[in-house]
């Protein structure tokens, strides 16, 4: 791994990033420092990109069972610009609004990207949360049936965004569990 050119972030850029994200100045500067350490040699941070492997190997994501989906949802063309990284950190910050967190959670959990969280997606979510490919079929069916019976308001065996949003709004733990401190900031 190389290192980006050590350009100081311009004050105007810092103010703009702070206005456009839910991050504090210190968090932005901490993310900037980490990004500089990871990005290719000789590049200015605004032109540099990180690979999905670099981002998914960060300590906070390395242990997350959804790291590949998180990276896919937040990256552009499978690479991360500094602004992509800021956007991801902003959504997972404590200060991000519930509606934004719900929108991104839905996109992350929609594995087949069909615009719904269907049985295929629910099975993948459960398997990843259990960290097992050998969960019993009965357990998978029980969990999927429970989720759908609680959240599938139109009984079509899948969750639309509005159904998912309704379910997450009722979940007291959602806001606390949909947080990641990426940079040790």
From Swiss-Prot:
Record's keyword annotation contains Calcium: yes
The keyword Cell division belongs to this UniProt entry's keyword annotation: no
InterPro entries xref list: CIBP, EF-hand-dom_pair, EF_Hand_1_Ca_BS, EF_hand_dom
Record's keyword terms, sorted: Calcium, Magnesium, Metal-binding, Repeat
EF-hand domain location: 62-95, 97-132, 138-174
Expressing tissues: Expressed weakly in megakaryocytes and endothelial cells.
Transmembrane segments: none
Entry GO MF terms: calcium ion binding; magnesium ion binding
Signal peptide coordinates: none
Positions contributing to Ca(2+) binding: 110, 112, 114, 121
CDD domains xrefs: EFh (cd00051)
Quaternary structure note: Interacts with ITGA2B (via C-terminus cytoplasmic tail region); the interaction is stabilized/increased in a calcium- and magnesium-dependent manner.
Extra information: The binding of either calcium or magnesium may significantly increases the structural stability of the protein in comparison to apo-CIB (calcium- and magnesium-free form).
Name the UniProt record assigns to this protein: Calcium and integrin-binding family member 4
Gene source species: Mus musculus
Lineage of producing organism: Eukaryota, Metazoa, Chordata, Craniata, Vertebrata
């Amino acid at each position: 791994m190389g290192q980006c050119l050590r350009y100081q972030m311009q004050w105007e850029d810092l103010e703009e990033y702070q206005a456009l994200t839910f991050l504090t100045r210190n968090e932005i500067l901490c993310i900037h420092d980490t990004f500089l350490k990871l990005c290719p040699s000789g590049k200015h941070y605004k032109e540099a990109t990180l690979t999905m492997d670099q981002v998914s190997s960060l300590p906070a994501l390395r242990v997350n069972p959804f790291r590949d989906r998180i990276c896919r949802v937040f990256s552009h063309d499978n690479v991360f610009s500094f602004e992509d990284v800021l956007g991801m950190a902003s959504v997972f910050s404590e200060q991000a609004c519930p509606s934004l967190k719900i929108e991104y959670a839905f996109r992350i959990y929609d594995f087949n990207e069909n615009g719904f969280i269907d049985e295929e997606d629910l099975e993948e979510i459960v398997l990843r949360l259990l960290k097992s490919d050998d969960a019993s079929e009965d357990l998978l069916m029980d969990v999927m049936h429970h989720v759908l019976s609680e959240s599938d308001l139109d009984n079509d065996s899948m969750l639309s965004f509005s159904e998912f949003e309704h379910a997450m709004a009722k979940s007291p733990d959602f806001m606390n569990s949909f947080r990641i401190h990426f940079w040790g900031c």
